[in-house]
Amino acid sequence: MPGYDTSLFTGDFDYHDIVEEKYYAIKFDTMQQKGKEAIDMSKYKAVIDSGTSIIVGPSSLVNQLTDGISVNRFCKGIEDLPDITFTFDGKDFTLTYEDYVLQVTEGDITECELAIMGSNFGPFFDYMIFGDTFMRKYYSHFDVANSRVGFALAKH
C-alpha cells in the first residue's frame, strides 16, 4: 500500500523536500497573478496544511498578489479573474478562479468569496499556508519516510 489512492489523481507526483521539519514546509520561489510581475518569495516557505481551509499569508504579500482581483459577493464577473501561479522549488502550480474563489449556494442564492487571505502573523513569520484551496486542485502526498511532499493533479 503506497499511502495514497491512485483513483484520486492523474499523472505522477512532483515531490518537494521538506525544508523545515516543524511543518510540512517546502521551498517557495515566487507567486504571480497572470499579467503582473512575479513576487519574490525566496525568503518565505510554503506550508502545506490540510488543517487550513484557504490560502493564508502575510497581508502585505497577499495584498500585492491579489491587487486588482475583486470578487463580487454575488459572483458577477468571476470568470474574468486572472490565474494565479505559485512556484515551489522551480515547479509552477496554477490556480484559476474556480480554484481560489469559494462559491457557496444556499437555496437559490450563490455567494462568492476570495479564498486567499492576508494575516499579520508577526515580524518573524516567514510562511505562507496552503490549505484546502490549493489541495483541492493538487492531490497531496505527505511522504513522511522520505521527508517530502508530492503533488499531482486531483481528479474531480
Predicted segment positions?
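Active-site or ligand-binding cleft "flap/edge" segments
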Residues: 1-156
